[in-house]
Amino acid sequence: MIFFIILRTIQTFRTHQLHPFTESAENKSIMMTQIEKYANSRNKKEKERALCWLTTFGIQSVVSLKPSEDFLDIIKRHIEGRCDIQQIHLDTREYYHQVHHRSHSGELAHHEEADKVSVRIMELLEQHECGLSAENFSKTHRHMFHGIYHDSGKLRERPASKKEWVLSNSSVLYPSSDLIGDYLDRLFSIERAINYSQLSSSHRLHSYSSFIARLFMINAFHYANTRTAFVYAMQYMLSRGYQFKNDTFYREAWYFRNAMIRACYTNMHQGIYPTTEYMVMFLGNLFHDEDNELRNHRMVIKGE
C-alpha cells in the first residue's frame, strides 16, 4: 500500500543569512514542527525514534538536504510505532518509482536523495551495532548512497581539497589516495585497542572525538565524506550504549562539522593546532544533556 497520497508543493528554500543550515521559525514547515513535538513525548519509544529522525535530518542538513513534506507525514507512523523502518523504506522506494513517471525536476531529485538517504541512515542507527573496520566503514557509505552515487563504497582515487568557511577558505590537508587503505586500517586497529572502561566520562568523549576527527580527515570517498563520518560516528557511539538526549544534532550539525575540521587542522605559522574541545562540547550536549554554548564564530580562524 502506498501511503504517500499526493506530492505536495515543496517550499522553496530561502538563502540563509547566518550560515547555510540556519532555519528560521517562519520557514519551518508545520509538518516538521509536528515531528519536533514527538521529541518531547512522554512515550519513551516515541521520543527515541523522533530524536533519531531529527539527528538524521541534521546529518542531511550539512549539504542543505531537507526531507519532503510527504516523507515527514509518512514517518509519523514509524515514530508512533505503527510500522517498522523496513516498511518506510519500501513505501519511499515505491513512492519515487511512481512520481518519476510524472516528473523529473531538479527539486524532485533533491528530495529523493534527502528522503531515501534519510531512511537508510535511520536503518543504520536502529541497528545499534558497528563493526570497527575499514570494510564496515565502506559498507556504511555503500548502504547510504547505492543507486545515488555510482561509486558508493569505493575509496577515493584522486586528490582532495575543499575550502572551508571556518578556516577562512583554507583546506584541511587530506592524505593522498594511495594511502587511504593503510590509514583506515591503522586508525581502526588503534581504536579497537582502546579500553574505554579505564577512561573517565570526559576522557571517553575526547577519545571518541579524536577517532571521529581522524576518520573524517582521511576523506576516504569521492563524495559525502561528512555525512558518512557523522553516521558511522553515531552508529559507533550508540553501539557503546550512548543515547540521544536531545535534538542537538538537528539544531547544530553545522557546528559539529566545523568542530571536526578544527580537530583536523594545523597551521604552525599561525600557531594553530588540532583541538577536540569543540567536538567534546557538542557530544557532551548530545549524549550527556550538558548545556555548553555552541558558537560557530568562536571556531573561525582568521586568514593570513
What are these regions (language model features)?
Residues 2-304:
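FIC/Doc superfamily catalytic core
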